[in-house]
Amino acid sequence: NIDGKGQEGLELSREDSLRGEDGAKVVLRDNKGNIVDSLDSPRNSVPKNGQDMILSLDQRIQTLAYDELNKAVAYHKAKAGAVVVLDAQTGEILALVNSPAYDPNQPGQANSEQRRNRAVTDMIEPGSAMKPFTIAKALDSGKVDPTDTFNTLPYKIGPATVQDTHVYPTLDVRGIMQKSSNVGTSKLSAMFTPKEMYDFYHDLGVGVRMHSGFPGETAGLLRSWRRWQKIEQATMSFGYGLQLSLLQLARAYTVLTHDGELLPVSFEKQAVAPKGKRVIKASTAKKVRELMVSVTEAGGTGIAGAVDGFDVGAKTGTARKLVNGRYVDNKHVGTFIGFAPAKNPRVIVAVTIDEPTANGYYGGVVAGPVFKEVMSGSLNILGVSPTKPLSNTATVKVPS
């Protein structure tokens, strides 16, 4: 910019290292102001260049995500939305977009809603997008196997009833994932103490700052396990009662894509692959990835996110919003998050649509199509080869 100073975002947060230092030279001038000699002086100094910052953002993926998000926000007459795209093996941020947004060349014309970087600063309750982690915890402990079957009829915890959108008398663990069963997920969570589940969520990064370098990033919200009611342990297992940003949620999914290790996220290109923190066993992460493919197959809640030519592991989420301390039935956040190729993930895409008011509100309906186009285009841009035969009607959107 013309001011030579960082105004917002990464440029502002890294201003001290990017700006460099001016040099100084003591000179002798004649009576007309012309320099006639340079003098030795302790005040002389050599100018220093600022440090380079090479961003990991891919302009092609960024443009694709921005266009698809804006179309969805308009079509569903939503309040807002956001998309995050991560490298599934390094944690590098390939795209991060928000809607509404503004022209950074004309910041004075933007209002506060347009200036918010929602994917980093805003907390959401992820809803069913948290279920893969509850399932992972149960599998990792050895308490269950993917073929174990559970009674998934509605049941009570105190005065509250835990139930599913559709009634399923029994489901195995794969079915709990595919059908997005609140009942099944809550029963898996009940196998552990509140402290064990709290520690697990904490290890996933919930309630912990990411130190991404972006100003205003939220830590999310995870209340002390000592304050949990019995029903809260159940609801947290399917994404109510804890909060995190969309970027935090995408980061948590690196546990599944990077063989059980939580990766740091970065807006800068990484010269060396970062070291992750072990959360679950590599074998568990592989099992969960396999289960999540069923979500985008026939009978799954995320069929709208299926990408031709690829096995896609994904999860939908639909959460009612908390207004004045109560969950309301007319305001929702729809989420769709997943990775591909499922066996050896290269990309994580996370989409959230806030308060859709037209043409549906479920995560699979409002966020699924955005996920599909962004994932398909990202894989194509990155040159990832298909993992299964292509149909004859496939089209891929790639910005020029």
Swiss-Prot record:
Q: What is this protein called?
A: Probable peptidoglycan D,D-transpeptidase PenA
Q: What is the lineage of its organism?
A: Bacteria, Pseudomonadati, Pseudomonadota, Betaproteobacteria, Neisseriales
> What is the organism of origin for this protein?
Neisseria flavescens
Which residue positions are annotated as catalytic? Answer: S128
Q: Supply the EC number(s).
A: 3.4.16.4
Q: In which pathway does it act?
A: Cell wall biogenesis; peptidoglycan biosynthesis
The organism's superkingdom is given as: Bacteria
User: To which protein family does this belong?
Assistant: Belongs to the transpeptidase family. FtsI subfamily.
- Residues annotated as region Disordered? 1-21
One biological-process term from Gene Ontology? division septum assembly
Against InterPro entries, the record matches this protein to:
Bact_Transpept/Beta-Lactamase, Beta-lactam/transpept-like, PCN-bd_Tpept
Query: What are the record keywords, sorted?
Result: Antibiotic resistance, Carboxypeptidase, Cell cycle, Cell division, Cell inner membrane, Cell membrane, Cell shape, Cell wall biogenesis/degradation, Hydrolase, Membrane, Peptidoglycan synthesis, Protease, Septation, Transmembrane, Transmembrane helix
Bilayer topology annotation: Single-pass membrane protein
How does the record comment on the protein's domains? The enzyme has an N-terminal penicillin insensitive transglycosylase domain (formation of linear glycan strands) and a C-terminal penicillin-sensitive transpeptidase domain (cross-linking of the peptide subunits).
Where does it live in the cell? Answer: Cell inner membrane
What single Pfam family name could you report for this chain, choosing any that match?
Transpeptidase
Tell me, in a sentence or two, what this protein's role is.
Catalyzes cross-linking of the peptidoglycan cell wall at the division septum.
Recorded GO molecular functions are: penicillin binding; serine-type D-Ala-D-Ala carboxypeptidase activity
Q: Looking at its record, which EC class is this enzyme?
A: hydrolase
Q: Which reaction does it catalyse?
A: Preferential cleavage: (Ac)2-L-Lys-D-Ala-|-D-Ala. Also transpeptidation of peptidyl-alanyl moieties that are N-acyl substituents of D-alanine
| PANTHER family the UniProt entry points to | PEPTIDOGLYCAN D,D-TRANSPEPTIDASE, PEPTIDOGLYCAN D,D-TRANSPEPTIDASE FTSI
Q: Provide GO CC annotations from the record.
A: plasma membrane
Keyword ATP-binding applies: no
